[in-house]
């Protein structure tokens, strides 16, 4: 009887885990998880990141603004458009999958916990590389300004800029770049899906490294490449929501460690 009950409990746990792993990769659940981050960043753009010199943001967001500019949308008009685009993309994705408009209330909270846990190895990696390189500053994964300038920001500005990096850098380097590369390699080039994913992750990590000006230093360059591989692996295995959460949490922790 005891063995039967234990077996039943194990089966229920495995079924619950499988349900969570699947649900957390669905676009509607990802939207529910990311919507508070999108709103927080938009509020940050309006208040915490605005000064007499303009609005401080990350390079990925600036790239998106330049893309909007090609369609005649000015930087001022497109500044808050990125968040809307991300929401629309997830909603369209949900409609195309034809999944029901139903959410498990606990799933977004569990995704936050998972994101925090998955961030820990990246923090350990950063500290190991930091101790063995010439640099002495924590390494945020967002190239906004130099570390000294990041350290001078208010806590709310640091929080907003970190969230923005998670949203827009993962949108650019993981959701868009990996998807495009995988389509070209697998659907067009007829490569094996796993091999195509690996190549896409490596290329994305290389682009992510070049994107960071600090990567000119050997130690920093190594970190950003490995971090790009890590983010790419998380994206492929656990989806867009979790990788955004990991990136944002990592940056929040690293930026908060910078000296004022």
Where are the model-predicted features located?
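Alpha-helical transmembrane segments of multi-pass membrane proteins
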Residues: 34-56, 123-127, 131
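Alpha-helical transmembrane segments
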Residues: 27-41, 114-118, 200-206
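N-terminal juxtamembrane cytosolic/stromal segments of multi-pass membrane proteins
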Residues: 1-28, 55-59
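Interfacial transmembrane-helix boundary/kink motif in multi-pass membrane proteins
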Residues: 18-26, 34, 68-76, 99-124
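Interfacial helix-start motif at the membrane-water boundary
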Residues: 63-86
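Transmembrane helix-loop-helix hairpins at the membrane interface
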Residues: 155-260
């Amino acid at each position: 009887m005891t063995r039967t009950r234990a077996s039943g409990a194990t089966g229920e746990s495995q079924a619950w885990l499988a349900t969570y792993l699947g649900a957390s990769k669905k676009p509607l659940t990802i939207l529910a998880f990311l919507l508070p981050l999108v709103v927080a960043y938009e509020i940050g753009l309006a208040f915490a990141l605005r000064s007499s010199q303009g609005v401080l943001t990350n390079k990925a967001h600036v790239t998106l603004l330049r893309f909007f500019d090609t369609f005649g949308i000015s930087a001022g008009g497109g500044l808050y458009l990125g968040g809307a685009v991300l929401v629309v993309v997830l909603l369209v994705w949900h409609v195309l999958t034809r999944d029901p408009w139903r959410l498990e209330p606990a799933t977004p909270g569990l995704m936050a916990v998972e994101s925090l846990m998955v961030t820990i190895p990246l923090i350990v990696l950063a500290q190991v590389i930091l101790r063995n390189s010439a640099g002495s500053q924590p390494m945020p994964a967002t190239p906004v300004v130099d570390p000294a300038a990041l350290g001078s920001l208010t806590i709310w500005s640091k929080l907003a800029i970190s969230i923005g990096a998670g949203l827009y850098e993962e949108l650019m380097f993981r959701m868009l770049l990996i998807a495009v590369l995988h389509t070209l390699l697998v659907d067009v080039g007829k490569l094996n899906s796993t091999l195509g994913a690996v190549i896409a992750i490596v290329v994305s990590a290389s682009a992510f490294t070049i994107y960071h000006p600090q990567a000119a230093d050997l130690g920093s360059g190594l970190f950003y490449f490995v971090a790009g591989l890590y983010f790419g692996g998380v994206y492929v295995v656990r989806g867009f929501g979790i990788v955004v959460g990991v990136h944002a949490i990592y940056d929040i922790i690293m930026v908060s460690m910078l000296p004022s």
